Curated annotation (Swiss-Prot):
Gene this protein is translated from: SLC44A5
Positions in the Cytoplasmic compartment: 1-38, 264-265, 347-351, 396-460, 537-610, 671-719
Residues with glycosylation annotation: 88, 190, 314
A GO cellular-component term linked to this record: membrane
One protein family per Pfam: Choline_transpo
Protein name per Swiss-Prot or TrEMBL: Choline transporter-like protein 5
Topological category with respect to the lipid bilayer: Multi-pass membrane protein
Organism: Homo sapiens (Human)
Free-text function comment from the UniProt entry: Choline/H+ antiporter.
Length: 719
């Protein structure tokens, strides 16, 4: 295409996307004389933060995290709480787990059976009647059985009296602790679900029950725990591993820092390390999954599906299924193919991205303080996350114990009514409904505060998202100001002022808090809409038809595209704010027009650079994830012994992997912001100047020559 055929220079396009910048001899980079922008949004933002602090204080007064850390028995007492009779009894035991199959489980959020705190779970099959027979010969049988009874229980009671008083379970069976609760110790034998090598067992009432019935009951309890916000139940694992998680995240931070420093000197070589490392790690994962899948083909029990075994306490059971490893292998193969195809089709653009990264390395070399800034972002994000988690836990555990009537037979007209366990046996309800129990149900209340707790949860989440996006926006604006100062210095480094990052950070806080809050508010609103959409999808999953599922899928896709597009525009708007000091809307408009006038350059440089850096993030997260997996599963010999007795190790593992990726993202975003700022400044440089003696370019000759070679500079600029 010759010059006359290029549509980029037509008047209509200039009219649509604004006039190009003109030469200004006084322009030397970020404007010093500024005024406050988007003041109204700044005031709203500050008021929301004040309200957030007040909410946290109120939640702290009313909440009790022990309710999340410890299970609660039928009397409302905590299991495992220090300084109480249950201090050494850390596990919750269900008298009759089979009752948890009742539909009232999800309706009342409580399994209609007595629950007590125990120090360990049963290890064998034994009924109460069998225990009484053995007790006459050996008193130790009662000593073992009484661990799972109330303190008032006596071994001489008849089975009828036992059922009436509800002092002991009629039968016990091999169990294991899961989420601090005794659940059946399931296993598979020749493709059949068993407990202790048995498929049938005695229920203590003269009947024979199937192990499958226990599986259904266990799944009912798991659904109940989901209804009570299962996320709070992992609090114990976090309490045991928080320092190991911090160590893993610190290692990720150091590793990311090392990569950033190496990018300063060996960007091209390091890219190949990223590429080979990511492809190698994924390839090893595929090979490992294939080996496991092949080995399991010889086991008959491995043909069961995940749906067949349901939700089980023994997580290793899932890794004994062919379906699990086959699914993992397919997912990894898809990821591997996508990465390889992107490397093949983007190989020429990747070369340009590496060149831009090298140029960005020079900028970081002149402004080395930018390598330290991610630590500040990490600290601020950690504060926001910790405050959100603590506030959410205290809100979720606010209230007083609420007790409700539970009738095991389900034939009591007073079922689900509130009651007082201290006087329940003397009330008319106990007489009208023999066998009814007054059990602990949940923590709640009828005060104004308790009525608005769901609203407070929404507010907590929304302000958290707003603060997270504000911290990210603040970092982007500060870094953009520092790198813009570098670019618009004619003689580098002589013309670069002292402390450019500190100056840019101070300007962003002093003058542009409102603009940054405005941009982050837009992102937070979009993210809230996405969360609400996912919540509705979860609640309405059973009532959905094909059309509604299709519409929800379309909405997810649209919101994802919208969020990423707004994030891209926001980043460039923050660059304009850092340079010119205008309000958010004006800066976003100027950035959009500038990008549209240089759309070819954007397509070649921007997203490809992010892809190169994305490989680095994957390598950091993957490396730390492998180490964390070996450590939390006790497969990595270390000087200090790792945490033991975790409910499930993937809680800290996923936290470390996800946190490592976020940390790597924070550090690599320095390079991403550097390249994007240099690119925006370069586009403005081409519009303001023509390379002559009177209007020299600010871009380095090396970068300018490379971009000309790659045909990223209009022909009129070459001449």
């Amino acid at each position: 295409m010759n010059d006359t055929e290029k549509p980029a220079d037509t008047p209509s396009e200039e009219e649509d996307f604004g006039d190009p910048r003109t030469y200004d001899p006084d322009f030397k980079g970020p404007v010093a004389n500024r005024s406050c922008t988007d003041v109204l949004c700044c005031m709203i933002f500050l008021l929301c933060i004040i309200g957030y602090i007040v909410l946290g204080l109120v939640a702290w007064v009313h909440g009790d995290p022990r309710r999340a850390a410890y299970p609660t028995d039928s009397q409302g007492h905590f299991c495992g709480q220090k300084g109480t009779p249950n201090e050494n009894k850390t596990i919750l035991f269900y008298f009759n787990l089979l009752r948890c199959t009742s539909p009232s489980v999800l309706l009342n959020l409580q399994c209609p059976t007595t629950q007590i705190c125990v120090s360990k779970c049963p290890e064998k099959f034994l009924t109460y009647v069998e225990m009484q027979l053995l007790y006459t010969k050996d008193k130790s049988y009662w000593e073992d059985y009484r661990q799972f009874c109330k303190t008032t229980a006596k071994p001489v009671k008849s089975l009828t009296q036992l059922l009436l008083d509800d002092d002991c379970p009629t039968a016990i069976f091999p169990s294991k602790p899961f989420l601090q609760r005794c659940f059946p110790d399931f296993s598979t034998k020749n493709g059949t679900l068993t407990i202790g090598s048995k498929m049938m067992f005695q229920d203590g009432n003269g009947g024979t029950r199937s192990v499958v019935e226990l599986g259904i009951a266990a799944n009912g309890i798991n659904k109940l725990l989901d209804a009570k916000s299962l996320g709070l139940k992992v609090f114990e694992d976090y309490a045991r591993t928080w320092y190991w998680i911090l160590i893993g995240l610190t290692i990720a931070m150091v590793l990311s820092w090392i990569f950033l420093i190496l990018l300063r000197f060996i960007a091209g070589c390091l890219f190949w390390v990223f590429m080979i490392g990511v492809i190698g790690i994924i390839g090893y994962g595929i090979w490992h999954c294939y080996q496991q899948y092949t080995n399991l083909q010889e086991r008959p029990s491995s043909v069961l599906t995940i749906y067949d075994i349901g939700i089980q306490t023994n997580i290793s059971m899932y890794f004994e299924l062919q379906q699990t490893w086959f699914t993992f292998m397919i997912i990894l193969c898809i990821i591997e193919v996508i990465v390889i195809l992107m490397l093949i089709f983007l190989r020429n653009r990747i070369r340009v991205a590496i060149i831009l990264l090298k140029e960005g390395s020079k900028a970081i070399g002149y402004v080395p303080s930018t390598l330290v800034y991610p630590a500040l972002t990490f600290i601020l994000l950690s504060i926001c996350i910790c405050y959100w988690v603590v506030t959410a836990v205290f809100l979720a555990t606010s209230g007083v114990p609420v007790y409700k009537v539970i009738a095991p037979g389900g034939h009591c007209i007073h079922e689900n009514q509130t009651c007082d366990p201290e006087i329940f046996n003397t009330t008319e309800i106990a007489k009208a409904c023999p066998g009814a129990l007054c059990n602990f149900a949940f923590y709640g209340g009828k005060s104004l505060y308790h009525q608005y707790i769901p609203t407070f949860h929404v507010y907590n989440l929304f302000v958290f998202l707003w603060l997270i996006n504000f911290v990210i926006a603040l970092g982007q604006c500060a870094l953009a100001g520092a790198f813009a100062t570098y670019y618009w210095a004619m003689k580098k480094p002589d013309d670069i002022p002292r402390y450019p990052l500190f100056t840019a950070f101070g300007r962003a806080i002093r003058y542009h808090t409102g603009s940054l809050a405005f941009g982050s508010l837009i992102i937070a609103l979009i993210q809230m809409f996405k969360i609400v959409l996912e919540y509705l999808d979860h609640r309405l999953k059973r009532t959905q038809n094909t059309l509604s599922k299709f519409l929800q899928c379309c909405l997810r896709c649209c919101f994802w595209c919208l969020e990423n597009a707004i994030k891209f525009l926001n980043r460039n708007a923050y660059i304009m704010i850092a340079i010119y000091g205008r309000n958010f809307c004006r800066s976003a408009k100027d950035a959009f027009n500038l990008l549209m006038r240089n759309v070819l350059k954007v397509a070649v440089t921007d997203e490809v650079t992010y892809f190169v850096l994305f490989l680095g993030k994957l390598l950091v997260a993957g490396s730390i994830g492998v180490l964390a997996f070996l450590f939390f599963t006790q497969r990595l010999p270390v000087i200090a012994q790792g945490p033991a007795s975790l409910n499930y190790y993937w809680v800290p593992l996923l936290t470390v992997i996800f946190g490592s990726y976020l940390i790597a993202h924070g550090f690599f975003s320095v390079y991403a912001m550097c390249v994007e700022t240099i690119f925006i400044c370069f586009c403005e440089d081409l519009e303001r100047n023509d390379g002559s003696t009177e209007k020299p370019y600010f871009v380095t000759p090396n970068l300018h020559g490379i971009l000309i070679k790659k045909q990223l500079v209009p022909q009129k600029q070459k001449e």
